[in-house]
Amino acid sequence: MNITASKEDYLKAILHLKEKNGYVRATDVAEVLSVKKPSVSIAFGKLAADDLITVHENHQVDLTKAGYDIAAKINHSYETVKQFLCSIGVPEKVAEHDACRVEHYLSQESVVSIGGLVGELSLIHISEPTRH
């Protein structure tokens, strides 16, 4: 199975929508990803063929266990990179954009190391004396 960055984006969007709304529809995914509904239908077909989502008769979608695992991993990478970038002074909107671009290409080892660095940076910021 070939998991492309595009498929990962769809899985992550489905995860977020499910957590936010309790359900996922193609129109919601299209809106989140700024794509047309026919593109979502094609992507859903590919994700279902890869057994990453289940499309129900009412057209709502759920992640399978495999789909959830991939979405959670990508989301963790995104959040870790975003936190790191924000902690070194990158504006939040820029950090969100950049994290979304690199989340697909980092190894788990890199994500763990970046997460450790984020933790160390937060400790440094906490322990810094207030300057007057």
Where do the protein language model's features map onto the residues?
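Append "Primarily bacterial transcriptional regulators
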Residues: 29-30, 47, 95
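Basic, amphipathic "hinge/linker" alpha-helix immediately C-terminal to the N-terminal HTH DNA-binding motif
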Residues: 59-77
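Amphipathic alpha-helical dimerization/coiled-coil segments
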Residues: 79-119
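Glycine-centered, phosphate/nucleic-acid-interacting loop/turn motifs that mediate DNA/RNA or nucleotide
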Residues: 51
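Conserved small/polar residues in nucleotide/adenosyl-binding loops
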Residues: 124-132
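N-terminal helix-turn-helix DNA-binding core of bacterial DNA-binding proteins
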Residues: 2-35
